[in-house]
Design a protein with these regions (language model features):
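Glycine-rich, flexible loop segments associated with nucleotide phosphate handling
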Residues: 121-129, 210, 224
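Helix N-terminus capping/helix-initiation residues
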Residues: 45-46, 124, 187, 254
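Short, conserved glycine- and acidic-residue-centered signature motifs
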Residues: 81, 137, 221
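Conserved G1/Walker A P-loop phosphate-binding module
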Residues: 1-120, 126, 133, 144-145, ...
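C-terminal-of-GTPase-core extension/linker across diverse P-loop GTPases
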Residues: 2-6, 11, 17, 145, ...
Length: 277
């Protein structure tokens, strides 16, 4: 399983990746500090596997692993190649699912940028999610148009391709209305046709709501987190609250220290453990 970690610049994406993999990717307060994707492979925590290993003492224990890819931050216009858009979209296409890191904290020392990377704007989770959604959808529209073109030419020699033209034409209208391919309603046969196009907005998505320490302590009282929850619920996506800064500290602790730290916070497992699982 390969998960692509995406997000606008300065939302805490690389800090979160560092905590997940301890890979030490540069994390700085300026856009595009992640230009080439950093890749880390992480073992999935599994208490059952730990128990079996303790019981039977095998020569080798091989846990399930997840590959995380820290993908370059993007800005509005990525689907047209602005910023690092082309790299961003190509890297996402190679992933099985998307982890979208959304900024849910205020910090006057960290710029919040969307389109103009020199302009600081108010924190807006809904707007941030919308920027990335639209860029993926616009890229998908171009892909769908090419599929329609190809199917129309093929249909001249084989009428079975007419169904592809119909399906992709309906999907194009859906995408042009600002909807993701994930939310397009169709039967299994049509879903198989669409799946073959490997569309970006068809990929499963998990929202990692990045909070500050105060917000993480009671995420459901955080107004930004509530916005992310509501948007995720509309498409049946999962939301995991994290505090990237805190998770980076936790990642440096050994097993017993980590447990004590989490106990002090009053939580059973870190946001990263939930994300990796």
């Amino acid at each position: 399983m390969k998960l692509g970690i995406v997000g606008l610049p300065n939302v805490g994406k690389s800090t979160l990746f560092n905590a997940i993999t301890n890979a030490g990717a540069e994390s700085a307060n300026y856009p595009f500090c992640t230009i080439d994707p950093n890749v880390g492979v992480v073992a999935v925590p599994d208490h059952r596997l730990d128990a079996l290993t303790e019981m039977y003492h095998p020569k080798k224990t091989t846990p399930a692993v997840v590959e995380f890819v820290d993908i370059a931050g993007l800005v509005k216009g990525a689907s047209k190649g602005q910023g690092l858009g082309n790299k961003f979209l190509a890297n996402i296409r190679e992933c099985d699912a998307i982890v979208h890191v959304v900024r849910c904290f205020d910090d006057e020392n960290i710029m919040h940028v969307v389109a103009d990377t020199s302009t600081n704007v108010p924190v807006d989770p809904a707007g941030d999610i919308g920027v990335i959604d639209i860029e993926l959808i616009m890229a998908d529209v171009e892909m769908v148009e090419r599929r329609i073109d190809k199917a129309q030419k093929a249909a001249k020699g084989d009428k079975k391709y007419l169904r592809e033209v119909e399906v992709f034409s309906a999907l194009k209208d859906w995408l042009n209305d600002g909807n993701s391919a994930r939310s397009f309603d169709c039967d299994e046969d049509d879903a198989a046709i669409i799946a073959a196009a490997e569309l970006l907005s068809l990929k499963p998505i998990i929202y990692a709501a990045n909070l500050d320490e105060e917000g993480f302590a009671d995420c459901h009282a955080n107004a930004y987190y509530k916005v992310v929850e509501e948007l995720a619920a509309k498409e049946g996506a999962q939301v995991i609250p994290v505090c990237a800064k805190l998770e980076a500290e936790i990642a440096e602790l050994d097993g017993e220290e980590k447990k004590m730290f989490l106990d002090d916070l009053g939580i059973a497992e870190s946001g990263l453990d939930r994300l990796i699982k």
